[in-house]
């Protein structure tokens, strides 16, 4: 019994450590204006980038063969755009290739493995926030996969829920101003 309690305590300590490590020790590569790695790193969310320096983020659009897109709703505790709709995405970790980052983010946030999905990289756009230290490239991917409700396992720290929407429904949501990045990525939703 004592050993079991000790193992349980160790398990919870490791879980707490992993959450802390992922939050506070995650590192990102710094890129130049040509999207080349500089060889330097930054801590996650340490917005100290100089003008001309960027980090890399990825977005993974999932479309079913019936033409519907998977979108998720951001949790209300997000500091930026709480409750807004979005597609899966996030930052590439140091040393991680863009394709690996998008596969990881989609799997973490939705439980869906897009490794065997049709599609892939579509385009990149650049977002600059002069003087704020948060400049980034966004690699946008589109995957076509037959996803069913039972395939989805939402990461509750990130999303309130999800839904599948048509192009028209997506445009209606975007018209409310509550779809993250829509103006930058709307071309990926077209045929």
Please describe what each predicted stretch is:
Residues 28, 53, 68-69, 84, ...:
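A residue-level structural signature of the nucleotidyltransferase/glycosyltransferase Rossmann-like core
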Residues 21-23, 78, 82-83, 94, ...:
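Nudix hydrolase/Nudix homology domain
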Residues 24-59, 65:
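Acidic, metal-coordinating catalytic segment for phosphate/diphosphate chemistry
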Residues 70-71, 87-120:
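The catalytic Nudix box helix
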Residues 3-4, 8-24:
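Short, Lys/Arg-enriched N-terminal segments with co-localized hydrophobic residues
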Residues 57-89:
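A glycine-rich, hydrophobic loop/mini-helix early in the fold
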């Amino acid at each position: 019994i004592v050993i079991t309690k000790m193992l349980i305590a160790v398990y919870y300590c490791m879980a707490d450590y992993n959450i802390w490590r992922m939050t506070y020790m995650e590192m990102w590569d710094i890129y130049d204006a040509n999207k080349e790695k500089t060889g330097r790193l930054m801590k996650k969310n340490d917005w100290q980038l100089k003008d001309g320096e960027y980090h890399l983020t990825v977005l993974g659009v999932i479309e079913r063969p019936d033409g519907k897109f998977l979108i998720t709703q951001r949790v209300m505790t997000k500091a930026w755009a709480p409750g807004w709709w979005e597609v899966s995405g996030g930052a590439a970790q140091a040393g991680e290739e863009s394709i690996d980052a998008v596969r990881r983010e989609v799997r973490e946030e939705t439980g869906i493995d897009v490794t065997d999905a049709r599609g892939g990289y579509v385009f990149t756009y650049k977002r600059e926030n002069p003087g704020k230290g948060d400049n980034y490239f966004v690699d946008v991917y589109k995957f076509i996969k037959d996803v069913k409700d039972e395939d989805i396992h939402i990461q509750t720290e990130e999303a309130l829920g999800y839904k599948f929407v048509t192009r028209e429904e997506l445009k209606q949501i975007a018209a409310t101003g509550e779809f993250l990045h829509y103006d930058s990525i709307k071309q990926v939703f077209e045929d």
